[in-house]
Amino acid sequence: MKTITLDPGERLAAGQLPRQGVLPAAIMQSAQAIVDDVRERGDVALREYCKKFDGVDVDDFRVDPKLMDEAIQAVDPAFIEALKKAAAQIREFHEREVEQSWFTSRADGTILGVKVTPISAAGVYVPGGRAQYPSTVLMDCIPAKVAGVKRVVMVTPPQKEGGISPYTLAAAKVAGVDEIYAVGGAQAIAALAYGTDSIPKTAKIVGPGNAFVAAAKKIVSGDAGIDMVAGPSEVCVLADATADATVVAADLMAQAEHDPLATCYLVTCDAAFAEKVQGRFAELLAASPRAEITSASLADQGVVVVAADLEAAIDAVNVIAPEHLELHCDNAMGLLGKIENAGAIFVGPWSSEPLGDYVAGPNHTLPTGGTAAFSNPLSVQDFITRSSVICYTPEGLMNDAPATQTMAQAEGLWAHALSAGLRRKMVEEGLEGFDGVDLGDINRIAWPVDLAAPKKAE
């Protein structure tokens, strides 16, 4: 791991961090070509890409729903128990996020409010092929169902024999997925965004994927909603000498084993503790079945920040704005209020980050690459729309029309003022409409009073 030592009064700079930055132009170009092709040729293009990238000939992308039931019977009952426990706790957490439509009224009878509506269909991308991520199925599909989305569609790359992992299928059953399609990559994102003969389009697309999936999501984001353009996973551990070095090392490795590009930060005021943590890696890596990936991540993307004091350490955490933050330090809960930027915060020595990955309840789809400074975890809010509701009475109109016309005149928007002025005239003169009515001076209906020009400074 690279070590950055901050002198007293020195701040960590964002430029010192191993950010992956923007998606490479070559990947964006490749993804754009795939998206355009699927948009134009639909299922024909999808089949060609499935053969090219997954090595599978696909006749029907739609996965038979009965395979979900068969998967429930095929996997170890202990896995089903774990799935159901995780699903229950994820559902319970996200039910607290549910918004209701609300309305309020003024004394003049005007009604104002917000109408909350679930989106029509949500597309969920679940990585597959050689890997299997049933936790992603739960985390991305359950909030959509809690929000009231009637059509939750899952896409995932087929395995070499053309099927889907039984773990993924079992999770889809538990999560309440409505449709599953065996297709992955940028081509799956294009299908969800624009629709094909086999795969009807969805209003929003969520879920993690490789760089091509991320690029495709970015490309289609003007035509379908997306949750985020996610980069490699990351963890930041803020620790002091009260933490256990072996546990902290394991927590860093838990992120590093995802991907050679996964980023691990250890922030501390104790250089000796940082060395102690790094000294634990060799023993733990010797037992790890993913040692090669983990070692590469720690060596190339791992960073130790040694700060002069706790204030500087917390400032460094906020500059990093990590996807996952662990507070392994004395009075961890007392520090919570000082943390400004983090996707998920794991407080205290017992709050293992993998608990949040799988079963705690809060969502594990989190902003990466410093975007936690302005972005949020996936939630029920990602699967709803909010519409403002405005309903005026004649009395309410008369109260607000004059100010509306004045504002419109200041902006030079004559028809805006006329729209309010015509209604005002109807109320003032008891008219039901303007058929056969002489409007007279239309300009005075729009702008009853001329605004004085702004005074010039003397």
Residue ranges and their predicted role:
Residues 3-8, 179-184, 304-309:
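Short acidic-hydrophobic, aromatic-tinged amphipathic segments that line or gate anion-handling sites
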Residues 104-170:
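Conserved small-residue-rich beta-alpha loop and adjacent elements
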Residues 228-300, 304:
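A conserved active-site cap/scaffold subdomain adjacent to cofactor or substrate pockets
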Residues 99-104, 225, 262-267, 287-298, ...:
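Flexible, glycine/charged-enriched surface loops at secondary-structure junctions
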Residues 1-120:
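N-terminal Rossmann-like NAD(P)+-binding subdomain of aldehyde/semialdehyde dehydrogenases
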